[in-house]
Amino acid sequence: MSTLQKTLIAACIAGAFVPAAHAEKYFSDSSISILYSDDYQAFGKTKTTQTFFTFENATGHDWGSTFFFVDRNQGHGKDTDTDDLYGEFAPNLSLSWLTGNKLGGDGLIKDFTLSGQYEFGGGTNVNNYMVGPGIDWNMPGFMYFVTRFYYVDSETSDDYQTTVVWGKAMEFGSTRILFDGYIDWSTAEDDHKSDFHFNPQLKLDLGNYRGSPGVLYAGIEYSYWNNKYGLNDDVMDTESAVSALVKFHF
């Protein structure tokens, strides 16, 4: 086991097994999503029709936060053999909590983090281990806005990744819209290209009309993925896929 993997595992354990007497849980949110698109990019410069079933869980604590999701995709027609499973687990340790000193506050920077991420499965059957610093921002108008800067121990040559995650709610009378998503950008190395993935969702809060905001959403997801999986255009075209989605929180 590499030093990076040991560091990541230690961070996960430190966050997940904080003694109950010294830990406070702020929230836990789970959701199930269904997405459908005819435009997902596949190997061989072809497009595929897929339905994705996604389970997500996010938690917030005084010591930091966790995020976990797993995707199960179902191909259709000629793409029925493209089914696979992909997931990520991302713990974040608050450096304010870890050091006992308030490193952020009411200004632009909310906190600094030690962040990790484990990626598994998917079309290339990855096992990637990621660790690095992060910043949680007090971005005006946003529910959350975070940046992460990872060193990536991957099955190809190790590289670096910058991740931006955001969530913003917009209200127009009784209509509530949620705009959230992420951006991943990773560096190029000898055996793979730099890749850029922009993946926002725009969702209508259906539950808000019945007095239950934040429960049931319907909308679209857009995936723009240049050099998908670090592959160049000779192998796979840039992905530009719009998906219909429904999402239920519980």
Task: Kindly label every feature range from the protein language model.
Residues 150-215, 224-226, 248-250:
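Outer-membrane beta-barrel transmembrane domain signature
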Residues 23-73:
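Short glycine/proline- and aromatic-enriched beta-strand/turn motifs that initiate or cap beta-hairpins
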Residues 1-27:
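Cleavable N-terminal export/targeting peptides
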Residues 238-250:
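Outer-membrane beta-barrel "beta-signal"
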Residues 34-40, 72-76, 116-122, 149-155, ...:
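Transmembrane beta-strands of outer-membrane beta-barrel pores
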Residues 55, 89-91, 131-133, 164-166, ...:
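Membrane-embedded beta-strands of outer-membrane beta-barrel proteins
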Residues 22-28, 63-67, 95-113, 138-145, ...:
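Short loop/turn motifs that connect adjacent beta-strands in outer-membrane beta-barrel proteins
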